[in-house]
Amino acid sequence: MKIKTRFAPSPTGYLHVGGARTALYSWLFARNHGGEFVLRIEDTDLERSTPEAIEAIMDGMNWLNLQWDEGPYFQTKRFDRYNNVIDEMLEAGTAYKCYCSKERLEALREEQMAKGEKPRYDGRCRHSHEHHADDEPCVVRFANPQQGSVIFDDQIRGPIEFSNQELDDLIIRRTDGSPTYNFCVVVDDWDMAITHVIRGEDHINNTPRQINILKALNAPVPVYAHVSMINGDDGKKLSKRHGAVSVMQYRDDGYLPEALLNYLVRLGWSHGDQEIFTREEMIEFFSLGAVSKSASAFNTDKLLWLNHHYINTLPAEYVATHLQWHIEQENIDTRNGPQLAELVKLLGERCKTLKEMAQSCRYFYEEFAEFDADAAKKHLRPVARQPLEMVRDKLAAISDWTAENVHHAIQATADELEVGMGKVGMPLRVAVTGAGQSPALDVTVHAIGKSRSVDRINKALAFIAEREGQAS
């Protein structure tokens, strides 16, 4: 049997982290078994589904590189198929037309609730032999079995049982002729030969209804696995107050897809004590039996730690391809300065996100308008003039412009002045970067370049002279 899984989001918003984890688990399970992964867009909610949401889902899947083997399928393009199956069920007696008015159903609901009963349809039209005109409005209901129970072996939670007496005669076609969500899902899983349905625990109550419809159609019943919810680190349902919840927001915030995938796979699944997983290791080790029944807590600090790890361990050339987008968002012209892969090596230790990296690299490529006020006040003082003049001349004299030779020039200046490296290094750092913090000074100056570094030191010396003039 070929394993076939699916990810079936509703395009009513962005791809959130809970949906992304479900997609990841479904994708990993299929890949682990040499199977296929299907993308299906469940867009039957015509009022809330939008093209923008569909695009956001596709963007998120592509950014995470969760490539599908089939699809994307759209339920709105399959309405004829659903209605044909409903018509066949009406003929077979496994579905029936219901003419009950909204007023009757509401009165029935209020009566049942007043008695402390669970609101459910009473089956009036199921047994009715009244004649109705062909154009009289009606819905179509599934004739759910009235005896026995539905038992399925959830691959995460174990056996789950529902009494058929607790299940309603589900509406499968509305008065406007449109099929309902639960019915479309059943026909899709049947037609697409889905063998394993991996989805959120909020779908558990749908499962017995869908199983009963599948059995009425004499269709194979897939294996089900329901994944627990993701909470914030405070134990409450994950929401925007806990940070980003959209996959593409994490892209915008400077996270690598490898970091988010690694974090999501560990939200409810484990393989021993291992924390870092390559994509290949995820595929090799993943199993539903190792997925926890308990809710997971989203910890942004842990995700940030993983992102920092991947920035520094993935090939710099690859990280640079993701950094490029953030550089463009900051409108930085990188034609005059280090290659982005070199920038990743320079700033990787200091920056935990690519957004932070893009926002802190401008001085490598463009001139800064002014020095940081606090850094200049502390380090661009008259006492710094001599160290800056000496190190400027030594840098200008370097014929082989390497980080090592830059280091020698700084060290030689400190040695000749008989001062610590900080007495030379800190004024130099402020002079060439405009601020008081940067990566190691030798590699920073080397990356900025000789001509630009010398020009900036001269600018700093002019700043010191102007400051002296104002003081006098």
Swiss-Prot record:
Compartments (UniProt record): Cytoplasm
The protein's Enzyme Commission number: 6.1.1.17
Gene Ontology cellular component annotations, sorted alphabetically: cytosol
Keyword Endoplasmic reticulum attributed: no
A Pfam family this chain is assigned to: tRNA-synt_1c
Signal sequence interval, chain numbering: none
Cofactor-binding details, from the entry: Binds 1 zinc ion per subunit.
Family annotation (InterPro entries): aa-tRNA-synth_I_cd-bd, aa-tRNA-synth_I_codon-bd_sub2, aa-tRNA-synth_I_CS, aa_tRNA-synth_I_cd-bd_sf, Glu-tRNA-ligase_bac/mito, Glu/Gln-tRNA-synth, Glu/Gln-tRNA-synth_Ib_cat-dom, GluQ/Sye
A Gene Ontology BP annotation from the UniProt entry: glutamyl-tRNA aminoacylation
Subunit structure: Monomer.
Function: Catalyzes the attachment of glutamate to tRNA(Glu) in a two-step reaction: glutamate is first activated by ATP to form Glu-AMP and then transferred to the acceptor end of tRNA(Glu).
Entry protein name: Glutamate--tRNA ligase
Organism field: Klebsiella pneumoniae subsp. pneumoniae (strain ATCC 700721 / MGH 78578)
Gene name of the encoded protein: gltX
